[in-house]
A protein has these predicted regions:
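A conserved FAD-binding loop/helix module that cradles the flavin
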Residues: 216-244
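Generic hydrophobic/aromatic pocket-lining and core-packing "Φ" positions
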Residues: 12, 80-81, 223
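FAD-site-proximal beta/loop scaffold in flavoenzymes
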Residues: 41-64, 149-220
Length: 246
């Protein structure tokens, strides 16, 4: 059934009443993380997922001549390549860690560089500057790597007195994605990072009969990992239904 918003048009209680005995949550991570710096609401600043979605839907996009992409994942490299293909004269990715810590797949990074995308490592934005309501530049600071953080990567630390400005007319924000889980009933527990908690063996959530998999559980990952989670959950759901006599 299409055109249905779970949590608005129907909820889990309604699904149980309709006779469903198991639910699988696979909503992905389609909510963009927000960059909490000044100037994020200027014209010419767009989230990478919104940008890629619009391009994929065939919408006409106004592409700047000089584009900066902020982030270091596969979405950042996809957005950078897309902007270049759509006519941008110069596209630069700003990433706050080193090449070794970059979460994007190595081949994605190589493809972007081969197509002409420039990558500046150990650089973070401090402020997005604008003129007449439109982005005109990004004030940046150079970083150095410190001790390992909770992600297992070395923590980027701003270098005092290293601020500089990059002029551009478009900023694409690709600093991460998260699942939109506002529709979930309170009985379903979340992990510390805001994803759905599941039993790693059965993929069942804290609510009996409800399973989950893919990016909604792991955070942004690969299609292969999502397919694997789906297969694992399907087996568990089958076993669960058999236990009910279904």
């Amino acid at each position: 059934k299409t055109g249905v918003t779970v949590g608005k048009d129907l909820n889990f209680s309604g699904l149980w009443k309709e006779g469903y005995t198991s639910i699988f949550i696979a909503v992905g991570t389609h909510k963009s993380q927000k960059l909490k710096i000044e100037g994020g609401d200027l014209k010419g600043v767009i989230h990478a997922l919104d940008f890629l979605w619009s391009v994929n839907c065939g919408e006409k996009m106004e592409i700047g001549k000089t584009v900066v992409v902020i982030g270091g994942g596969n979405v950042a490299t996809d957005a950078a390549k897309t902007a270049l293909r759509l006519g941008a004269e110069k596209v630069t990715i700003l990433y706050r860690r080193s090449r070794e810590e970059m979460p994007a797949n190595p081949w994605e990074v190589k493809e972007a560089e081969d197509e002409g995308v420039k990558i500046e490592f150990l650089v973070a934005p401090k402020k997005i500057l604008g003129e007449n309501g439109r982005v005109s530049a990004v004030e940046c600071v150079r970083m150095q790597l410190g001790e390992l953080d909770e992600s297992g990567r070395r923590k980027p630390i701003p270098m005092e007195g290293s601020e500089f400005t990059r002029e551009m007319d478009m900023v694409i924000l690709a600093i991460g994605e998260a699942p939109d889980l506002e529709f979930l009933p309170k009985e379903i527990e979340l992990s510390e990072d805001g994803t759905v908690w599941v039993n790693p063996i059965t993929m069942e959530t804290s609510l009996q009969g409800v399973f989950a998999g893919g990016d909604a559980v792991t955070g942004p990952a690969s299609v292969i990992e999502a397919i694997r989670a789906g297969k694992c959950a399907a087996e568990s759901i089958e076993n669960y239904l058999k236990s009910l006599g279904g």
